[in-house]
Amino acid sequence: PPVSLPSDRRLKKNIIKIGESESGLNIYEFEYINKKGTYQGVMSDEIPKEAVLVGDNGYDTVDYSKLDVDFKRIK
């Protein structure tokens, strides 16, 4: 199964757009509401649906292997 990472806007705060990928996807810097650190990635509601999975908890996750954006912790 693909590795998917939490990417639902409802789980994030301090969301700042920092750029776009080559394919035109918005790239954001953000913090998770319930987790320490600052991360870089996408918002699940803005990307192709084939890269979005819905977890058992009802929140979206993203299969980053289908995107030209890397998810990473930056702080």
Tell what function each PLM region has.
Residues 2-75:
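C-terminal intramolecular chaperone/autoprocessing and neck/assembly modules of extracellular spikes
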